[in-house]
Amino acid sequence: MAYEKVNELNLKDTELCLGLPGRTEKIKEEQEVSCVKSNNKRLFEETRDEEESTPPTKTQIVGWPPVRSSRKNNNSVSYVKVSMDGAPYLRKIDLKTYKNYPELLKALENMFKVMIGEYCEREGYKGSGFVPTYEDKDGDWMLVGDVPWDMFSSSCKRLRIMKGSDAPALDSSL
């Protein structure tokens, strides 16, 4: 308003504003009055914002980023990939659903429709065309049944059902 009295021009309609949207008219009026008082030159203190506030803190939106319910409880499942020599597809199984090796081997036999047989420490998987192996956390391939079940279920990364002719490299008894 004081600005209009000095110049006697109505420039308010065409005025370009560099402020953020939502600022009040009161701040504009105070700046206009201060320009008139200092011969249309603003002082350094007048150019600074009166309210030096910190930027608003970023709060995380609840539910973002989206997490699948299957990934929320990682302790309740332990999925590993299962491959079979000659099969064109992979499967995944949850090791926590099985309590011991016989249950796991039975599930693998049903899944791939093959006969694996039972494991014997001295003979390995004799009498079977396929041998179940697994990769542990260190990247070593071992026969399923070589270690106690708890150690196996915690260290297994992948399962592979190999042809019996490929397995002698893992176990010298075959």
UniProtKB/Swiss-Prot annotation:
It is found in: Nucleus. Residues 44-67 are annotated as: Disordered. Coiled coil: none annotated. PROSITE patterns: PB1. Preferentially expressed in vegetative organs. Pfam families: AUX_IAA. A motif (EAR-like (transcriptional repression)) lies at residues 16-20. It comes from the Eukaryota. GO terms for molecular function: DNA-binding transcription factor activity; identical protein binding; transcription cis-regulatory region binding. GO terms for biological process: auxin-activated signaling pathway; response to auxin. Homodimers and heterodimers. Interacts with the auxin-responsive protein IAA1. Interacts with TPL. Belongs to the Aux/IAA family. The N-terminal half of the protein contains two conserved domains I and II. Domain I includes a slightly degenerated ERF-associated amphiphilic repression (EAR) motif which seems to be involved in the activity of transcriptional repression. Domain II is required for the correct degradation of the protein through the SCF-mediated ubiquitin-proteasome pathway. Interactions between Aux/IAA proteins and auxin response factors (ARFs) occur through their C-terminal dimerization domains III and IV. Aux/IAA proteins are short-lived transcriptional factors that function as repressors of early auxin response genes at low auxin concentrations. Repression is thought to result from the interaction with auxin response factors (ARFs), proteins that bind to the auxin-responsive promoter element (AuxRE). Formation of heterodimers with ARF proteins may alter their ability to modulate early auxin response genes expression. This is Auxin-responsive protein IAA2. It comes from Arabidopsis thaliana. The gene is IAA2.
